[in-house]
């Protein structure tokens, strides 16, 4: 059986120090760090955020999508 933790698919994404303060849906540069190339929100185990921070980031990403600042999906590769 493979060791899941050493799998190359689950390598942690280094985002440096997690953000300080509040998350805003207008801060697109920050939110793009927590979105995959396909446009999906990255999970906590990859981003290294706390549960509270992850909920705030997810909510901000969803708000930015509804306003039109972020795409729902990335169609560049298709």
Curated annotation (Swiss-Prot):
Annotated GO biological process:
translation
Q: Which InterPro entries match?
A: Ribosomal_bS18, Ribosomal_bS18_sf
Main location per the UniProt record: plastid
Where does the source fall among the domains of life? Eukaryota
GO molecular function (one): structural constituent of ribosome
- Cellular component per GO? chloroplast; mitochondrial small ribosomal subunit
The UniProt record lists the keyword Ribonucleoprotein: yes
Coiled-coil positions: none
Location relative to the cell: Plastid, Chloroplast
Concerning SUPFAM superfamilies, the annotation shows: Ribosomal protein S18
Keywords in alphabetical order: Chloroplast, Plastid, Ribonucleoprotein, Ribosomal protein, RNA-binding, rRNA-binding
> What PANTHER family does the database record attribute to this sequence?
30S RIBOSOMAL PROTEIN S18, SMALL RIBOSOMAL SUBUNIT PROTEIN BS18M
Q: How does it assemble?
A: Part of the 30S ribosomal subunit.
By sequence similarity, the record places it as follows: Belongs to the bacterial ribosomal protein bS18 family.
Q: What is this protein called?
A: Small ribosomal subunit protein bS18c
Gene, per the UniProt record: rps18
